[in-house]
UniProtKB/Swiss-Prot annotation:
Protein's organism: Shewanella piezotolerans (strain WP3 / JCM 13877)
EC class (word): transferase
Cofactor(s) for this UniProt protein: [4Fe-4S] cluster
Binding-site list for [4Fe-4S] cluster 1: 68, 73, 79, 308
SUPFAM superfamilies: Radical SAM enzymes
Native organism taxonomy: Bacteria, Pseudomonadati, Pseudomonadota, Gammaproteobacteria, Alteromonadales
Annotated protein name in UniProt: Lipoyl synthase
Gene: lipA
Cellular component annotations (GO), alphabetically ordered: cytoplasm
Cofactor binding note from Swiss-Prot or TrEMBL: Binds 2 [4Fe-4S] clusters per subunit. One cluster is coordinated with 3 cysteines and an exchangeable S-adenosyl-L-methionine.
UniProt subcellular location: Cytoplasm
Example of a GO MF term: metal ion binding
Length: 321
């Protein structure tokens, strides 16, 4: 059996090159076997792309990344047109290789020590009032990137004292207590960590992740910061049943998570995990009703919902679909 080639620093692996390195084989989808996308998932492009161009230029100017672009989010046009973006720190190369995700895999470069200041200035220039900061997984770092998150939060608040900051963090490779000790110095206004799918599908969809680690991360943060909302997101269409998702919702509530996002998985390319079903808006409404009935303070559930989609409105408890 041939060993995978040694990863070179800074080289992005995508699509077939990326998924070939995971333990579960993903067979490329043939066009005639792919499910037809229903009408409710058709995204209308805005008439003007000027605001989109401006935001992309602001990101490029300071060498920053948005998860909107790197993960091929279907809401990019809408969010950029409204002047919002989710910033992705610690580079654009992930040490994990989840076959549902379009972010590149590889051997990341050393974190940019100037990124926190560049990020803060960009946010000020864009006159943003609410930002989401996320990152790739950095299993190569002893703290999983926690210190870089804290540095970014500190610098953002120095230049933008009125801003609200939501962090969408990785699992820090199970180094939970160390990461939370660091984040306690500069906690966010909303703490988000996505479970992504039901535990039965972790080996297939999230190699390297651990369901209980993720739940423990959310619960331990809440124990330390009882007044800061905790949040998590899930995708549907990876082979899970509605009953499995319902159990995950109960698990989240048992770990004191208050906010939920639930959306449809969309296959980034034929080399990624296939969409096994398209969940109807009515089913999302049913799961939203369940979430609210078991105590979530806010649940954004719909085909195009993503964890940072209209995050400012989610944090205010407004309806998002």
């Amino acid at each position: 059996m041939n060993r995978p080639e040694r990863l070179q620093p800074g080289v992005k692996l995508r699509d077939a090159d990326k998924v070939s390195r995971i333990p579960v084989k993903v067979v490329p989808s043939e066009r005639d076997t792919m499910l037809r996308k229903p009408d409710w998932l058709r995204v209308k492009l805005p008439a003007s792309n000027q605001r989109i161009t401006e935001i992309k230029q602001a990101l490029r100017k300071n060498g920053l990344h948005s998860v909107c672009e790197e993960a091929s989010c279907p809401n990019l046009s809408e969010c950029f047109n409204h002047g919002t973006a989710t910033f992705m720190i610690l580079g654009a190369i992930c040490t994990r290789r989840c076959p549902f995700c379009d972010v590149a895999h590889g051997r990341p470069l050393k974190p940019d020590a100037e990124e926190p200041k560049k990020l803060a200035q960009t946010i000020k220039d864009m006159k943003l009032k609410y930002v989401v900061i996320t990152s790739v997984d950095r299993d190569d770092l002893r703290d999983g990137g926690a210190q870089h998150f804290a540095d970014c939060i500190r610098e953002i608040r120095l230049l933008n004292p009125e801003i609200k900051i939501e962090t969408l963090v990785p699992d820090f490779r199970g180094r939970i207590d160390k990461a939370l000790d660091i984040l306690a110095i500069e906690p966010p206004d909303v703490f988000n960590h996505n479970l992504e799918t039901a535990p039965m599908h972790y080996r297939k969809a999230r190699p390297g992740a651990n369901y209980q680690w993720s739940l423990d991360l959310l619960k331990k943060f809440k124990e330390r910061h009882p007044d800061i909302p905790t949040k998590s997101g899930l995708m549907m269409g990876l082979g899970e049943s509605n009953e499995e998702i319902a159990q995950v919702l109960h698990d989240l509530r048992a770990h004191d998570v208050e906010m939920l996002t639930l959306g449809q998985y969309l296959q980034p390319s034929k080399f990624h995990l296939p969409v096994e079903r398209y969940v109807s808006p009515a089913e999302f409404d049913e799961l939203k009703d369940l979430a609210e009935s078991i105590g979530f303070t806010h649940a954004a559930c719909g085909p195009l919902v993503r964890s940072s989609y209209h995050a400012d409105l989610q944090a205010q408890g407004k309806e998002v679909k």
